[in-house]
Amino acid sequence: MQRFFPWLYDLVMTRAERCAIGPWRRAVVERAKGLVLEIASGTGLNFVYYPAGTTIIATEVDERMLARARARADESSATVILVVADAQALPLRAGVFDSAVAGLAMCTIPSPSRALGELQRVLRDNGSLLMLEHVRSTSTLVGRLQDWATPLWQRVAGGCRLNERTVERIAAVGFRLDSVEPHRPEYVVTIVARNRVRSIDQALPPLHEHK
């Protein structure tokens, strides 16, 4: 099953991308500025939406998914550099990225909080965190159904958790939430957040510049 998962993933996502998810992805990706990091990029479904002139470091831990992403990277108007890397332990320098993007990714990362901590580390102060994610529903009934279905769904869908609480995790690690926009269904959300400013000294220019 795992061997064929990348192919099955693209097959299942094709209709969803055309109906709704594609425009949502575009709206998220087009907000990315400067040097961009994309984590858990999967088969590269975001790549088509990056504007020309953008440079993206795209990471993915599953080399089978990355193999399918290579063709999309070559077709993108942007410069996409693919890196085999775990979002929970990024082999990247601290404080170098202006924007970080994740598209339907946090639900499959074993420790989302570790991944968010890594994003904090590699983003510049006040850098943008841009996400399209499915999360646990705010509806009591739907949320309980997600809780019930998640153990089985994880087995057949590459570890995906239907009841992930991504918004709460983002706030808990210290990002500043700018907006959370629900779509239809309401458990698919666009999240925009900002990295914390690590210190006043880093936020202000040297004092001699004010003289």
Residue ranges and their predicted role:
Residues 3, 12-15, 130-184, 188-190:
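C-terminal alpha-helical "lid/dimerization" subdomain adjacent to the S-adenosyl-L-methionine
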Residues 35-89:
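Class I SAM-dependent methyltransferase SAM/SAH-binding core
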Residues 88-100:
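A short acidic, Gly/Pro-enriched loop at the edge of an enzyme's catalytic core
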Residues 175-211:
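Core SAM-dependent methyltransferase catalytic element
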Residues 113-125:
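A short glycine-rich, Lys/Arg-flanked "PGG" loop and its adjoining helix->strand segment in the class I
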Residues 1-33, 45-46, 146-153:
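Conserved class I S-adenosyl-L-methionine
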Residues 55, 126-128:
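Short glycine-centered segments of the SAM/dcSAM-binding site in methyltransferase folds
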Residues 98-111:
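A short SAM/SAH-binding and catalytic strip from SAM-dependent methyltransferases
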